[in-house]
Amino acid sequence: MSRALRIGLAGLGTVGSQVAESVLSGVIPGVSLSAVCARDKTRDRGVDLSTVRWVDHPNDLAEAGDVDIIVELIGGTGDPAAALIDAALAAGKSVVTANKALLAARAMHLAVISEASGASLAYEAAVAGGIPVIKTLREALAGNKITRVCGI
């Protein structure tokens, strides 16, 4: 049996706390929560994080040996979210983000880092209200020539 994919989670707001709860409760098989980072360790998030390692700075997740993939749910176009994603991709760690603003501002920059390191940048949740349109375009419609996608 292969070991679980070890997640480093940055941001424990509404979405981040739900992700943590889902992983810790086993709803997502084959995944474990190795480390988390948030501004306030003492805030009640409605999920028991006592068994999870806390790091002081988001970039610590990118450097952690017990983290395979980063889930960035901090938000915003600047640091600490931007620095975390840059550091994680440069270190060869794949990143999952729902950060529309950061992707709009830095997508090309992040694509260059991702390509150079071989790490993936997954952002499906940031597009089309979370509808799996990116996967559909890449996989199910790969044989078609799509010239434009429009949305509101």
Q: Which functions belong to the PLM regions below?
A:
Residues 16-17, 81:
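N-terminal Rossmann-fold NAD(P) dinucleotide-binding loop
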Residues 25-47:
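NAD(P)-binding Rossmann-fold cofactor-contacting core
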Residues 80-86, 90-91, 100-137:
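Rossmann-fold NAD(P)-binding glycine/threonine-rich loop
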